[in-house]
């Protein structure tokens, strides 16, 4: 049995970028992907920032549409319209995106085995990891878990609890949707603890989705999806649905993401952003950190067990800190939504100085960057920050968040 430096389980963005980076360091890499085709089944909305394409080392050839802003709806209040002429996000061909990264990994020299579902993992006293897949046995000195929210590697590390968002959606054709604007729906009755969305692919095609926390049968996303269509009929006039899909988003929660010789990256590590559910950018950046950690470990110990205990601290100093802040922001959002305070927030953010702050500082990848500017403007406009009318109950988690934000600076 030939031993590989690193076995990567999963050939999504996390796995393929890991393989690319590991090969850049001259390490031997085997990628095991359970599906027979890269990028399928599709479970992602495909909305990313330009920063994500840069991180992937990719040009705009896979971009289907450019997004300049958002329309945010909740209840009967006037929608909050954000955006200008600046491109804020990109709609990508997600299947082609995954294929591109996987092909780059193969071109770099990684071995890719499709249709290989990992069934068992074991560690040996010598420091080697044995991986069983498709009645075959593989061995490596280091194991990367990039195998999504149901990660076999994560289970091997002892993780059992995840904060899952249950999603349902698809693609369709509508009569009228702004080509350069996404729509976000915050109503608690159609997306409890999360939100709904429409993302235009072009002048007529849209991606539609809804999400909620895993819970009671009446919260099944397919039922909430139908509620969304009924509650906003003018938005879905002439809708013809062309495809449907569902899945889960593992929002950031503290997990064991490293062991002596195993690392978790991307959704396997529950590294999806708590505010938006996006996980591609965090997966790409996590893969780079993980690959560097593996290279350093293998360079320092030529034989025998390795130690990967620097990965968590390195990750925590970069995007890890933002994910912690994002978790606090999500608590604020859920409190506002459950207390029916989101309409008040939408009205407040429509005030010109606050809206300007959102335009200037809003960032899908780093949402916490918006908090302090908003609070400064709010404080100057209406007295002490957080004393927004009708929001006293909902202000407490925001106070906790600001306190934590200040302590981490």
Task: Please describe what each predicted stretch is.
Residues 49-100:
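A conserved beta-strand/loop capping segment in the N-terminal third of enzymes
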Residues 11, 104-237:
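Predominantly flavin-linked oxidoreductase catalytic cores and closely associated redox partners
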Residues 20-42:
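Glycine-rich FAD pyrophosphate-binding loop
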Residues 1-12:
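Beta1/beta-strand and adjacent pyrophosphate-binding region of the FAD-binding site
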Residues 120, 216-299, 305-306:
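FAD/FMN-dependent oxidoreductases across multiple families
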Residues 35-56:
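Conserved N-terminal glycine-rich FAD pyrophosphate-binding loop of Rossmann-like flavoproteins
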């Amino acid at each position: 049995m030939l031993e590989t430096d690193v076995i990567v389980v999963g050939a999504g963005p996390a796995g393929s970028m890991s393989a690319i980076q590991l090969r850049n360091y001259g390490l031997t890499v085997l990628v095991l992907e359970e599906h027979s085709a890269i990028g399928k089944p599709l479970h992602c909305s495909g909305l990313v920032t330009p920063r994500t394409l840069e991180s992937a080392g990719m040009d705009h050839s896979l971009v289907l549409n450019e997004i300049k802003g958002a329309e945010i709806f909740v209840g009967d209040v006037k929608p909050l319209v954000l955006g200008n002429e600046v491109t804020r996000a990109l709609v990508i061909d997600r299947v082609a995106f995954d294929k591109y990264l996987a092909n780059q990994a193969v071109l770099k020299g990684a071995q890719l085995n499709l249709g290989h579902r990992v069934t068992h993992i074991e560690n040996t006293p010598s420091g080697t990891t044995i991986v069983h897949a498709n009645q075959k046995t593989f061995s490596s000195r280091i194991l990367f878990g990039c195998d999504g929210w149901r990660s076999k590697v994560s289970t091997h590390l002892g993780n059992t609890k995840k904060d899952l968002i249950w999603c349902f959606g698809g693609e369709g054709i509508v009569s009228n949707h702004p080509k350069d604007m996404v729509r976000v729906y915050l109503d608690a009755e159609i997306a409890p603890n999360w939100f709904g969305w429409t993302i235009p692919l072009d002048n007529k095609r849209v991606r539609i989705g809804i999400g909620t926390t895993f819970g009671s049968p009446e919260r099944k996303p397919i039922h909430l999806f139908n509620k969304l269509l009924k509650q906003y009929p003018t938005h879905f006039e002439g809708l013809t649905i062309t495809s449907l899909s569902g899945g889960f988003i593992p929002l950031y929660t503290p997990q064991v993401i490293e062991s002596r010789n195993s690392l978790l990256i991307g959704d396997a590590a529950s590294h999806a952003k708590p505010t938006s559910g996006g996980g591609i950018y965090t997966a790409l950046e996590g893969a780079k950190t993980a690959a560097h950690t593996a290279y350093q470990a293998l360079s320092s110990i030529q034989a025998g067990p390795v130690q990967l205990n620097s990965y968590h601290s390195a990750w925590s100093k970069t995007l890890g800190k933002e994910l912690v802040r994002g978790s606090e922001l999500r608590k604020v959002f859920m409190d506002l939504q459950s207390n029916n305070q989101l309409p008040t927030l939408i009205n407040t953010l429509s005030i010109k100085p606050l809206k300007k702050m959102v335009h200037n500082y809003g960032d899908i990848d780093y949402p916490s960057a918006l908090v302090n500017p908003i609070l400064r403007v709010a404080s100057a406009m209406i007295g002490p920050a957080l004393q927004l009318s009708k929001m006293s109950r909902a202000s407490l988690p925001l106070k906790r968040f600001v306190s934590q934000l200040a302590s981490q600076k």
